[in-house]
Amino acid sequence: MRPEGSLTYRVPERLRQGFCGVGRAAQALVCASAKEGTAFRMEAVQEGAAGVESEQAALGEEAVLLLDDIMAEVEVVAEVEVVAEEEGLVERREEAQRAQQAVPGPGPMTPESALEELLAVQVELEPVNAQARKAFSRQREKMERRRKPQLDRRGAVIQSVPGFWANVIANHPQMSALITDEDEDMLSYMVSLEVEEEKHPVHLCKIMLFFRSNPYFQNKVITKEYLVNITEYRASHSTPIEWYPDYEVEAYRRRHHNSSLNFFNWFSDHNFAGSNKIAEILCKDLWRNPLQYYKRMKPPEEGTETSGDSQLLS
C-alpha cells in the first residue's frame, strides 16, 4: 500500500529491457575480469603503500610553500604600516620646521637666561614627547592587529610540517651553537611557538612553547616572560617545569654539570646568566620570519627508494 500523495512512474517496456540487457552485459564483464581486477587491486595497494612517504613529503613541502606566501603577506602589511608611519613623521617634522621658521629666534642671551629658556623649552617638549610615544604605541598595536590573521594562518600551516620549530631553532646560526643532541630530541616534541608583546603598562615580551606528550616533562605549555627596555630583555616570570621522575635526576645533573649558556639551561632555569640573549633571538628574529632558517628536505627522485636520511636543502 503506497503512502497517500505518493507518485508512481511506470518504466516503459523497451527501457526495462534495455536496463536488463545492460545489467547482463555488466555482470558478464565483471565475471570475466574477476581475476584481472584482483590483480589490479593488489598492484594498487602495493603502489599506495610505496607512495605514502612521498605523499607525506609532498604535503609537507606544500605547507612550506604556503608559509612562503603567508610570510610575504606579513611583510607587505608591516612594510605598508612602516611607510605610512614614516610619511606621517616626515609630515609632522616639516610642519614643525615651518612653525619654527615663522617664530623669530631669541636675541643675544646670557648663560643664565639661556639655561632658563632651555628649561622652559624642555617643559614644553614633555607633553609633545608623551603624545609621540602614545601615537607610536597606537600605531604599533594597529600594525599587530593587521598582522594577526596572517600570523594565525601561519601557525595553522606550520602544524602540517612535522618538526618545523625544532628544525628552525637548530639551524639558526646563533642557536645551533647552544643546542645539544638531547636538546634537539626534546625540541622534536615541540608543536608550536607563539610570541606576544604588551606595551602597557610596561613593555613585556611573552614566549610560549607548546609541546605534545614526551618522556621528559608533563607541561603542555611553557611560558617565559621578559621585561623589555632599550638595552636588554630582563627575566620576569617562567612556568616551572614538571619533570617526570625518570628524568628529574638527569635534568638536575645537566643543569649543574654545564654552567655555560645553552638551550637546556635557558629552558630549565629562567634566571640563568645570559638567557636574555636566547629570548631576544626568539622574539626579534625567529618569530618574525622562521622560514628563513628552515632546511627543506629534497624530494625523492622518481624511481629511487626513500629513506629517513633524505638530503637537506639550504
UniProtKB/Swiss-Prot annotation:
UniProt entry tagged with the keyword Glycosyltransferase: no
GO biological process: one example: spermatogenesis
Gene behind this protein: TSPY9
Entry function: May be involved in sperm differentiation and proliferation.
GO cellular component: chromatin; cytoplasm; nucleus
Protein keywords: Cytoplasm, Developmental protein, Differentiation, Gonadal differentiation, Nucleus, Spermatogenesis
A Pfam family annotated for this UniProt entry: NAP
Listed name of the protein: Testis-specific Y-encoded protein 9
Subcellular location(s) per record: Cytoplasm; Nucleus
UniProt family annotation: Belongs to the nucleosome assembly protein (NAP) family.
Annotated InterPro entries: NAP-like_sf, NAP_family
Entry GO MF terms: chromatin binding; histone binding
UniProt superkingdom: Eukaryota
